[in-house]
């Protein structure tokens, strides 16, 4: 099989057409290759209980607009809140013990990320609500298991059997719980704003609940507020937790990076504090993150699409109608693009930024055919700027406040199944509190 030729495979979702990265540019914005339909086919977003997948691909695009605009543009205003929440939750999940103790890294980081993402998406009150934290932490896991259950059945039976499948039932229950929490919150806010207007005052909330509601009203479109939050959870929380956990594993296995990273944090934050500019200037950290994502993206193929018509590519290759299509990410490990591609080199992209014309390409948030950790093109992850800054804040806190190292005998090898590569969910790290050089 040539890595430069398209091929077909059979997976649990049926027939998949895998394209080499050279087609990424053609695929990226082709209107006959539907991102929305792919989500419906892959995740059954048309069925009850899977609304968290549906809302993120809503044709009104308000989710994408919020992630691309409000979330990105408001980062400067929420950075302090993210840092504050991070400091609080680390006391619970990593503890303040100066003695070495073991943690299951992915579980601990899920609790950390659930709190700090919810702080931005829902505000201070809800981000500490135990019921919401349980919902946001478990919905994607349960829904993905439900998807796997349904894939065992013929497509024509799925709308029927989903009413009897255990994880499908749990998914529907979590959606209802989310609505019972979020809808009253939104209604209360609307009443407060209406009352404030009557008295000539103004009430604003700088979080995703507000951004989504304002944008939906502005565009005159309907949306499901609770499922929009579940969609943010699916898109932001679980993928970010996986990415962040893998970064920690890679640093733990390359401990020579720890002191240079700490020195960079102290130099940058010591002078500039928390700001968009200071996070940009954490260039070694940015390089380490991008290298971690290069070696272990969330999947070995990206740019999931569904062909709504026969699609003829520039060299005559025809993608038949009604097929799921993806683009291979194998250039991540191709020596033609990366020297010693299987070696973890934390300075790889740090050094690349110094090469003429490559400063932009070498940044974590840049999406290219040879690094599709965040996808590529029109549907590249719109929340990658937020994810980048959120991870940098959390990693800065951990590097300054904790020592950490691998636990002997605990494998950090990613879990691979199908097209997926997940950070090992059972791997442990040994951590202990240290005295930070500067207050952050």
UniProtKB/Swiss-Prot annotation:
Disruption phenotype: Leads to the loss of gibberellins production accumulates ent-kaurenoic acid but not later intermediates. Pfam families: p450. Its EC number is 1.-.-.-. GO terms for molecular function: heme binding; iron ion binding; monooxygenase activity; oxidoreductase activity, acting on paired donors, with incorporation or reduction of molecular oxygen. It comes from the Eukaryota. InterPro entries: Cyt_P450, Cyt_P450_CS, Cyt_P450_E_grp-IV, Cyt_P450_sf. Its cofactor is heme. This is Cytochrome P450 monooygenase 1. It comes from Gibberella fujikuroi (strain CBS 195.34 / IMI 58289 / NRRL A-6831) (Bakanae and foot rot disease fungus).
């Amino acid at each position: 099989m040539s890595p430069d030729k398209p091929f077909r495979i059979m997976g649990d979702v049926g027939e998949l057409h895998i394209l080499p990265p050279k087609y990424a540019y053609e695929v990226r914005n082709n209107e006959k290759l539907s991102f929305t339909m792919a989500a419906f086919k892959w995740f059954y977003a048309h069925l009850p209980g899977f609304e968290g997948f549906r809302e993120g691909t809503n044709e009104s695009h308000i989710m994408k607009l919020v992630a691309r605009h409000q979330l990105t543009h408001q980062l400067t205003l929420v950075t302090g809140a993210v840092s504050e929440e991070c400091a609080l939750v680390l006391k619970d999940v990593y503890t303040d013990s100066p003695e070495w103790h073991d943690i299951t890294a992915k579980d601990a980081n899920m609790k950390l990320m659930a709190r700090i993402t919810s702080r931005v998406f829902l505000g201070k009150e809800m981000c500490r609500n135990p019921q919401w934290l349980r919902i946001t932490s478990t919905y994607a896991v349960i829904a993905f298991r439900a998807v796997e259950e349904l894939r065992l059945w013929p497509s024509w039976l799925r709308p029927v059997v989903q009413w009897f499948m255990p994880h499908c039932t749990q998914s529907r229950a979590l959606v209802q719980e989310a609505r019972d929490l979020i809808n009253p919150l939104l209604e209360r806010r609307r009443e407060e704003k209406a009352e404030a207007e009557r008295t000539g005052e103004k009430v604003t909330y700088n979080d995703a609940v507000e951004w989504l509601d304002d944008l939906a009203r502005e565009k005159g479109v309907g949306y499901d507020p609770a499922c929009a939050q579940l969609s943010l959870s699916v898109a932001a929380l679980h993928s970010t937790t996986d990415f962040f956990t893998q970064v920690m594993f890679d640093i733990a296995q390359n401990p020579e990076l720890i002191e240079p990273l700490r020195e960079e944090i102290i130099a940058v934050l010591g002078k500039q504090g928390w700001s968009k500019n200071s996070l940009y200037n954490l260039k070694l950290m940015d390089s380490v993150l991008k290298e971690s994502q290069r070696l272990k993206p969330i999947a070995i193929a990206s740019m999931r699409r569904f062909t709504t018509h026969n699609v003829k590519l520039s060299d005559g290759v025809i993608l038949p109608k009604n097929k799921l299509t993806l683009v291979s990410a194998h250039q991540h490990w191709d020596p033609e693009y990366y020297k010693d591609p299987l070696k973890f080199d934390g300075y790889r992209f740090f050094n690349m930024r110094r090469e003429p014309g490559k400063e932009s390409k070498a940044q974590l948030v840049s999406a290219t055919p040879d690094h599709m950790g965040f996808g590529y093109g029109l549907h590249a992850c719109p929340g990658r700027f937020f994810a980048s800054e959120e991870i940098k804040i959390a990693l800065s806190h951990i590097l300054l406040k904790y020592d950490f190292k691998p636990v002997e005998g605990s494998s950090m090898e990613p879990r691979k199944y199908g097209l997926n590569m997940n950070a090992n969910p059972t791997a442990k790290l040994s951590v202990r509190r240290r005295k930070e050089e500067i207050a952050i």
